Amino acid sequence: MSKASVVIVGGGIVGLATAWQWGRSHPNESLILLEKEDSIAKHQTGHNSGVLHSGIYYKPGSMKAINCRQGKKLMEEFCREEEITYEICGKVIVATREEEIPALEQIFSRGQANGVNCEKIDQSRLKELEPHVNGISGIHVPEAGIVDYSEVCVKLQKKIQEQGNQIICSAKVLNIHQSNSEIILETTIGEVRGNYLVNCAGLYSDKVMGLTSQKTEMQIVPFRGEYYYVKPEKEYLCKNLIYPVPDPAFPFLGVHFTRMIHGGLECGPNAVLAFAREGYKRSDLNFSEFLETLKFTGFQKLALKYWQMGMGEMWRSWYKPAFVKALQRLVPEITAEDLIVAPAGVRAQAVTKDGSLVDDFLVDETENILNICNAPSPAATASLNIGRLVSEKLATRFV
């Protein structure tokens, strides 16, 4: 049996950031982090596009806006201190049609309200920044950047262990129950006990929450995001980061071009329903998980409302020319021959019972349990601040 003051479930970047921040502020209170895989950062974090988000898209005052802005500063400081390579390269958000201008204006207004360094640009300035882009106007965000979040996680893992706290891999949580003031977790490596539990289980955060006494009407619906690498000889088509104007009805940013910190250029992702919570390939099927998604009232309402968009995403997934067509709206010179299939990611998206996509970070808490229920993008950028806030919340429970 293992025991600690705090037990964290989930070894992605949010769980690791929380563990590190706790260890910094409470060096005398023990912590155990449990990860079901054989190493850290195997899922959302390890399949991240590596963008340091500025916070331009998010509703002012929202958890995403606040944590992204503060988290980005903390992430840059951490990278400098730990000698992790990152680059503030800038990005452009591009309107290709007149009907996108109102949404572009709203993004710019949000950026200003959130304190983001951004400017509206015309077609000629757009061409100066990205000579191969097609657009009628746009927004330049000089402070956006790129980093390898897996490297950040490796460094966090080392620092957590240096604090004297434990990271236990291959430790899947099977059941959770409470006895007096203790939380008892039954895992594949035996019993783990703690006074406080933080659920950072990402794609399975609702499942872990369901093992506790807390109940929720939301459910995680997995959306696969598929990527392509651009062949080296065509990387000149994008100098830094090129994004479209996203559909304001969805918390997805649309297929875009991303230069990577260690070289190379990738494009994507789309957002297609995955048939398994860890369904990184189109052929991946977990029948019970897929059936659970289909039976969920919230998903049924979501699918009924947005079936056309869903079918379009599915079409782009199966038919490469359709994916290429979406990219050509931004960079007309890109062709199907320029693209090489890259690893996909899966986004853990919380959906409510009424069919709404949860658009903000969601934290559910009781006296001794904190569940981070919805932490998709920009959670990697925001992770160090999320970890700091969770640590502060936990601290109020210690007498």
Role assignments for model-derived ranges:
Residues M1-V14, I32:
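Beta1/beta-strand and adjacent pyrophosphate-binding region of the FAD-binding site
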Residues G23-H47:
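Glycine-rich FAD pyrophosphate-binding loop
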Residues A41-G71, E82-Y86, L273-M309:
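Glycine-rich active-site loop/strand segments that organize a redox cofactor
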Residues G50-R125, G135, G254-V255, A276:
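Dinucleotide-binding Rossmann-like beta1-alpha1 core, especially the glycine-rich loop
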Residues K59-Q70, V94-A103, I139-K159, I168, ...:
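Short beta-strand to alpha-helix junction loop
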Residues I139-Y196, C200, Y204-K207, A382-A395:
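Helical element adjacent to the flavin cofactor pocket in flavoenzyme catalytic cores
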Residues R282, T297, L302-V399:
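C-terminal catalytic lobe of FAD-dependent flavoproteins
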